[in-house]
Regions:
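Glycine-rich FAD pyrophosphate-binding loop
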Residues: 37-57
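N-terminal Rossmann-fold NAD(P) dinucleotide-binding loop
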Residues: 29
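Glycine-rich Rossmann-fold phosphate-binding loop(s) that bind the pyrophosphate
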Residues: 25-26, 48
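Helical element adjacent to the flavin cofactor pocket in flavoenzyme catalytic cores
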Residues: 157-219
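Dinucleotide-binding Rossmann-like beta1-alpha1 core, especially the glycine-rich loop
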Residues: 61-144
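Extreme N-terminal leader/targeting segments of oxidoreductases
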Residues: 1-20, 35-39
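Active-site substrate-recognition segment that forms the wall
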Residues: 35, 46, 94-97, 190, ...
Length: 277
């Protein structure tokens, strides 16, 4: 049955009070649902669209330690990210695989500079390292990246990071939460809250597929709606002031023949100072 929607909806009863109701079915909300259900809490998750439909399905698809943050001296952040990379591989080996990256260099100084950075990256990974960084000759770089047209390339470096199916991992979390006893209902929108003595007691839900309304009672409500968090807060308090300052990245999708082969490329610095994967 797992995520069979009619079965999930049939478990919603106006008289029941859930231990926790999670609003938002992206990676964060689904992860919370797994932890809550695994802790023995009666858990309900509400998602207004499809699971992982928003930000969680629009990632870089990379599982990496944040090599670019080394230049900013965010060592603890990189170390933590490398630990999480290893944890993801351990917990979801069916969704996470390694990915070779090549960094082309246009001067020997840059080759040495990037090499030292990747050496530190490998050292921070320690036993969790996925492979050694290797130095590539100019001819090897062009062999591995035949479409590369950069002028003056003197060589490059190859290191290993990871990639994953973000939607696949999110759905795996949803199925795990359901197996642990959580109820997850998608295409259901929160339309308002009811409070008592300043505390939220229940939420009004509208089924996005059939239009019927429901009232959900819970001891705790979790806002896991990501960039829509402020909008949800205004349902509780119309005078709520925005707390988030959303940032936006751009991901472009090309046919595989644009960059043939199985190697990825990292451009450490573009003309406008960006890092491009």
């Amino acid at each position: 049955m797992e995520l069979y929607r009619p079965h999930m909806k049939s478990q919603l009863q106006d008289s029941k009070t859930w231990d926790v109701c999670i609003i938002g079915g992206g990676a964060t909300g689904l992860g919370i649902a797994v932890e809550a259900a695994n802790s023995g809490l009666s858990t309900l998750l509400i998602e207004r669209g499809d699971f992982a439909q928003g930000t969680s399905s629009r990632s870089t698809k990379l599982v990496h330690g944040g090599v670019r943050y080394l230049e900013q001296r965010k060592i603890s952040l990189v170390r933590e990210a490398l630990q999480e990379r290893d944890r993801m591989l351990h917990n979801a080996p069916h969704e996470v695989t390694d990915q070779a990256f090549i960094i082309p260099a246009t001067t020997y100084w840059k080759l040495a500079y990037y090499g030292l950075g990747l050496l530190l990256y490998d050292l921070l990974a320690g036993r969790r390292r996925w492979g050694r960084t290797t130095i590539l000759s100019k001819s090897k770089v062009h062999t591995l990246l035949p479409r590369l047209k950069g002028k003056g390339i003197v060589g490059g470096l190859q290191y290993l990071d990871g990639k994953f199916d973000d939607v696949g991992l999110a759905l795996a979390l949803a199925k795990t939460a359901a197996k642990k006893g959580a109820v997850l209902l998608n295409h259901a929108k929160v339309t308002g809250f009811q409070k008592k003595k300043g505390r939220i007691q229940s939420a009004s839900i509208q089924d996005g597929l059939h239009g019927d309304a429901m009232t959900i009672r819970a001891k705790a409500f979790v806002n896991a709606t990501g960039p829509f968090s402020d909008a949800l807060c205004r349902l509780d308090n119309p005078r709520h002031k925005n707390r988030l300052k959303p940032s936006q990245g751009v991901h472009l999708t090309f046919d595989a023949d644009v960059l043939p082969g199985d190697k990825a490329v990292l451009i450490p610095k573009t003309s406008d100072g960006r890092v491009v994967f």
